[in-house]
Amino acid sequence: MFPYPTLNYPPMAPINPMAYRDPNPPRQVAPFRPPLAAQIEDLRRSIANLTLKQRAPNPPAGPPAKRKKPAPKPKPAQAKKKRPPPPAKKQKRKPKPGKRQRMCMKLESDKTFPIMLNGQVNGYACVVGGRVFKPLHVEGRIDNEQLAAIKLKKASIYDLEYGDVPQCMKSDTLQYTSDKPPGFYNWHHGAVQYENNRFTVPRGVGGKGDSGRPILDNKGRVVAIVLGGVNEGSRTALSVVTWNQKGVTVKDTPEGSEPWSLATVMCVLANITFPCDQPPCMPCCYEKNPHETLTMLEQNYDSRAYDQLLDAAVKCNARRTRRDLDTHFTQYKLARPYIADCPNCGHSRCDSPIAIEEVRGDAHAGVIRIQTSAMFGLKTDGVDLAYMSFMNGKTQKSIKIDNLHVRTSAPCSLVSHHGYYILAQCPPGDTVTVGFHDGPNRHTCTVAHKVEFRPVGREKYRHPPEHGVELPCNRYTHKRADQGHYVEMHQPGLVADHSLLSIHSAKVKITVPSGAQVKYYCKCPDVREGITSSDHTTTCTDVKQCRAYLIGNKKWVYNSGRLPRGEGDTFKGKLHVPFVPVKAKCIATLAPEPLVEHKHRTLILHLHPDHPTLLTTRSLGSDANPTRQWIERPTTVNFTVTGEGLEYTWGNHPPKRVWAQESGEGNPHGWPHEVVVYYYNRYPLTTIIGLCTCVAIIMVSCVHPCGSFAGLRNLCITPYKLAPNAQVPILLALLCCIKPTRADDTLQVLNYLWNNNQNFFWMQTLIPLAALIVCMRIVRCLFCCGPAFLLVCGAWAAAYEHTAVMPNKVGIPYKALVERPGYAPVHLQIQLVNTSIIPSTNLEYITCKYKTKVPSPVVKCCGATQCTSKPHPDYQCQVFTGVYPFMWGGAYCFCDTENTQMSEAYVERSEECSIDHAKAYKVHTGTVQAMVNITYGSVSWRSADVYVNGETPAKIGDAKLIIGPLSSAWSPFDNKVVVYGHEVYNYDFPEYGTGKAGSFGDLQSRTSTSNDLYANTNLKLQRPQAGIVHTPFTQAPSGFERWKRDKGAPLNDVAPFGCSIALEPLRAENCAVGSIPISIDIPDAAFTRISETPTVSDLECKITECTYASDFGGIATLPTNPVKQETVQFILHQVLQLLKRMTSPLLRAGSFTFHFSTANIHPAFKLQVCTSGVTCKGDCKPPKDHIVDYPAQHTESFTSAISATAWSWLKVLVGGTSAFIVLGLIATAVVALVLFFHRH
């Protein structure tokens, strides 16, 4: 029962029920109160009643409500003296997520449902667009009764299961979008970056159990569903499912990605299976059981959860690290430094505590990574960034990192250090030296390695610039975190330690350090060997008769070819390589802009490079004619530019394209000398031939009349009758032989036929009558079959209203006029925005730089060993007998000649392969796609994607468009191409498995992470030198590096027709080759009947200014007088003229000025405004600019190239000369006839 309410005021006195009451009490008169006072009093009483009588009962007993800051309850006075114990220190709360992340988490929590398997979350299913999507690789049941009852369909190609959600849930689902501009998006773990068509997150963000989570944009729409991921350097690439613009699902899976279902990966330890993130001996770790921990890691070397097991072994202690940096440093506490052979210690060969194992210089800007036998950032007792450790004999010693120095031709700058590795910025040199000072002792090691500054881009600068342009490059990351690359470790082999042996009581005594084990080997005279953990006395009397080996199984060492391998079956471990090559952005120099000078069809570049700079050019026509030259000093270069265009690229500047215009210095419409100057600049050879012809005609015309008159004068002076034996001229004789003739008229012909041949007379008479009958029959057939024929033609026209052929040139529109009987013409414009030739490709293999792996050799003292086959690429193994190795100054074996050494070597991918590799593709016939802008009538459609195959129709609004196929089946790609970085090369590479040493393809694999590695590097093992533990070998240089030096120019620099080569997918864009047939079906709604078309009267077109072959260089004025003010269309009937604007409002009375582009000297085009038409004529001048940065229109016809003025002058010239010739001939004939008649 709930308690009664407690009253906080004193109770009233009890009333006596038997008290006397007057039955007729006197009536009391209430005192007079003003109305306002009475109202106030009533209000006061009502408030008092509410506060006293309407008290709420106490709340029932139950859990208190959650509050951020609960109010303290009142306590009695005695309780104030006793202070409660201080509350436990609460952990610092994580910062609240941002607004976008909160919205993302809210939407995800409402629309995403976990998939349960064995009581734990294995993945997620999300509801998008009225459907539920569940990853196919995620097993389990959706944690929702309604969704779990849905029957899902499988789409294995997308790794998804999907089904329609119930009707009650369709209004509460997420919406998807195909718009994915580059930038950042949201998901459960924060921001996701989308760049280069890939979703990436920082490494370590997301993982197992996140499959099925959605990626949202700022509006809460789903852009992708996560399926898995793969680590790529410092970031993780996500495998996702997205949607394209047509709403079709698209799967994007990077190479090597793994599904992110929360499937527990198991590891093994001595026949015990356990989760890799929970070793069976938890909370034991490396500090407590070092040997067992190393053994556990070695047995799970090939497990895909090796990183989890390593992390659990290193972080198993409860002590919290200060920062994540120290956490990754603690991985190398499993290893120790060592002493190894160095070829040059400053004086000679020696066993050095800082021997150089490897030098890598594959990054740009002169950064190298050095691996040594010393360790950096570690002390003997823990992690310390300011110290380095090395082996001082048999003990480990630490000194300050300031004592370390690195140099090539000059001292290097130390960038970072970690584990066995140093990252340094070095000047160019042929050798690398690493050393340190330990008090008075100085240790150095020098190896031969060429260090050079590798510039980025097309300019050979020698120092990093202060400013410039950012270009992709390769760099070594400075992070020490897990980057996905490993260095191989193993437990060290046995090394003789003579300090463990001593003479005690004339016997050899073996002293064992505390907590260690020693293996001994004695020969006095019988051979005795064993392992002891306490002091042991042998029967030998001389220290030389025994060898003692300290068993060091608590630390790993690098699996070096300069260290002997341990006896028996030795397992391997691995640690992360700290500084790995990654893709980055580097600042490259930008050469000074060239000084450009334009002349007629000539481009002059004045170049002033600061350092050697590459200049490349190519023609944009069918013959690319590429050039490539390095400019080292200021110079001037000239290039011929044609109407097809020229592209030049100077240094790291973007490529520029220029086109020649039909410019000239003269005037094609001026005086003859101006016409000659104009055509001489434009067509020099043709002009010279024409001038020579005209001069020859003039000379002949002048010489012939003079000779004729001289001959006539001679004939007139010497008549025929006075000359003896005179002969008649041949011309007069021929004229005399001609018989005069006379033609009869029609009546005489008919009279002759009637009298001589009446049959032929009637035949001639009936011919006109037969022709009249045939014409009448044709007209009758037209009346009978004409309507049906027109209907058929109308149906055909409705199916494809307009067909034409347009040039395959981007940016130059095709314009036409579509006419229909009874309708106003409709303007049609089709412009190519982008074209792509996309071939089908097949990846044969990838190739990259290899790395030779040399394991520790097996040294068998006083015995023999043998090689075994191992599945490694280009694996080489050889046993050498009669070796006598020394180890750190002492003999390693008893025997002199009976010892054997087994040397091994093989090839593997270098660490740079993940970012620096080439892909070999076989190319087959592909497809052609285009993006077009279409305008018909008042309808405009932008960026429509169509297939240029002549078969696939594209829906453009209510119109249907079919484009293609191309008139020329051409492609810039050969049958084999190589993709390297962002460039594509036509290269005839060898087939898979047939690579040759030292050439392209000496290292091959299907993907960058696959195990099908093929190598042919001519690897040969050499006999080791006496007294040194090492594995010498010879090998051919990397064929990939050789190909990079000799690869030549990429397709972007040599492809004809101005093609631009792009990737993802491989394609050639905007190739101006051939022509494209088009066919478009225009709907009836786009046509306007003539009765509804506005009319315009009094049209007159006047060209006020015109420059041909220029970008809308013509200006014309059109006086108009429309019936009513409307917006009308202007329609051109010619193709060589283009209007800048096709629609404009026309006023009641006034004029309209429009711009047009033409390639003719004398433009004469018909312009139609509504139903009225007018012809525009005029003269155009040549353009003043010789070179422009846009493609200009050029005419190729002879009649259009020669102006009317030039034709007029030519006619006058030829016409005057002909007149003189004709007059001379007539005079000659007259004189000859007169003389002839006088003679006879």
UniProtKB/Swiss-Prot annotation:
Where is the sequence biased in composition, kind Pro residues? Answer: 23-34
Q: Could you tell me which residues belong to the region E1 fusion peptide loop?
A: 883-900
> Ranges of Basic residues compositional bias?
65-102
Reactions accelerated catalytically = Autocatalytic release of the core protein from the N-terminus of the togavirus structural polyprotein by hydrolysis of a -Trp-|-Ser- bond
GO MF annotation list:
RNA binding; serine-type endopeptidase activity; structural molecule activity
Site: Involved in dimerization of the capsid protein. Where?
A: Y185, N218
Q: What is this protein called?
A: Structural polyprotein
Its taxonomic placement starts with:
Viruses, Riboviria, Orthornavirae, Kitrinoviricota, Alsuviricetes
